[in-house]
Amino acid sequence: MVDKFLIETDQNEFQPNLWKNGDSDRLPNRCPETQLNVLVVGAGPSGLMTALECWRKGHNVVKILERSNSPVFTGDVIVIGPSALRAFRHWPDMCAELEKSKMDSIMYYRKHNGELILGPTSLGHNDPEYTAAWKGIPFAAPHQIRKDFYRMLLRQVARVGIRVEYGQRVEKYFDDEAAMLGGVITDQGTIMFADLVVAADANRTRSDLLIAGAHTPSRSSGMSVYRTAFPTERALQDEAFRTRWGDAIEKGISHHEFWMGPGMHLGLFISPEFVAFGLTPRDSFLHEGGNEPIESWEPDVDPEEVTKVLNRVPDWNPVIKSLVKNTQRGSIVHWPLLWRNLRREWTSKSGRVVQAGDAAHSSIPASISGGTLALEDAVTLASCLHLSCSSAGSKGAPLGARIYNLLRYQRVSCVQKMSFVNAEGLSGSSMEDAIKENPESVRVRFPRWLYRHDPEAYVYEKYGQAFAHLVEGTDFENTNLPPGHTFEPWTIEQIHKDMMAGKRVADFLDGDWS
């Protein structure tokens, strides 16, 4: 039996009637109703968290539409940073679940031949000097089990009585300015309206056509990823794996390791329950004649192909080669890391349709912030709508959506640029110098300005200034960016041009990105 990377489950498992809801002891204090009806499209983490935070802020979430026929779980990990986890302090059940399922892991950085560069260590936000600041919020583990985290969100959505309707693929978004409504048309011809429609249905969302007139063109980031996950008991059948990690697994210790070679890196997660790895080669290191990377979760890659990619760089440690070689056939996905240049506008002309999460901005794994940004979006949008609609009702929704866009655009752009710095370091472009001068420099960047951010507090701090900027044209400056940074828009084409000229991305980051 093949271990599936993608698992579909019963669409009725998380229907509200099956879950206890309305228990005031376990639900957040809800803000007074704003009379704003919100329709959410997309039942991924961004859409689910948007629905929850909108409910908490007093908005009426009509329903969530999801194109899949049931909840879909992938079998690996997700990183959620403290800035996103702050919102969970309002949700007792989810806080308890995060505490129960928290899983710390030891992090190591190694050369591809196994030589230790740095470790044991952790993500920067869990360094001892910072952990005191996280009192009252869930522990920001180096990772969350993606399936468990997703199921937690689905359960909470059910508890507050919000229904997810599956098998609802949205083919068109539209504005009805006369009626002051946004709307969607599904592939079944069903038309639905709401005061505000949140497009959280990932990249190539049809909301692009309404907001920008076309989908944002995909550009290669210059990288792709071979990705898989499988039970640890299967990995332990490999003698080399068992010899290296068997004792730690038996003691319940989890490892998160980065193996760094010229032109490629391998991220490896090992826990007592499952093993996951992602090999990220630059396109020039792909095996000629191998499977082209496509945006599909169909696991159709032979481990032999991945081994050939590894062999493009000599001296990989035998334990990594053995792990890849013995991965089960039909369990590896080859996913292209495509880039979509960030658009400034995330709202429709009327402001009644707004994008969130991957629908608004793409990310690559090296940012380790895609999930964090998606949840920050949700918290920010719901809070902006709270302020814009508390007195104006649904009429205030467009302004709230535009202020959300203003508060998020520059921050997201900075996080996106940081992902190229991480990818550059992990792929060994300056590894030798880094090892000699400062091993800490190879550490994946998870900077202070990113993880110290409180998206909800930021809305209440900046809303008045943002309002004046949009309505009266006064100056406005975001402060959720690297200190001292002067923001300028950028494109993937510019990044590639600079890299081709021999420049390092890290060298042209002004301000404090630490």
Curated annotation (Swiss-Prot):
Q: Tell me which cofactor or cofactors this protein depends on.
A: FAD
Q: Which protein, by its recorded name, is this?
A: FAD-dependent monooxygenase CPUR_05423
Q: Highest taxon of the source?
A: Eukaryota
| Coiled-coil segments | none
Where, by residue number, is the active site? R227
Q: Which InterPro entries does its entry note?
A: FAD-bd, FAD-dep_Monooxygenase_BioMet, FAD/NAD-bd_sf
Query: Which purpose does this protein serve, as stated in its record?
Result: FAD-dependent monooxygenase; part of the ergochrome gene cluster responsible for the typical purple-black color of the ergot sclerotia. The ergochrome gene cluster produces several ergot pigments including the yellow ergochrome secalonic acid and its derivatives, as well as the red anthraquinones endocrocin and clavorubin. The pathway begins with the synthesis of atrochrysone thioester by the polyketide synthase (PKS) CPUR_05437. The atrochrysone carboxyl ACP thioesterase CPUR_05436 then breaks the thioester bond and releases the atrochrysone carboxylic acid from CPUR_05437.
- Could you say which protein family the record assigns here? Belongs to the paxM FAD-dependent monooxygenase family.
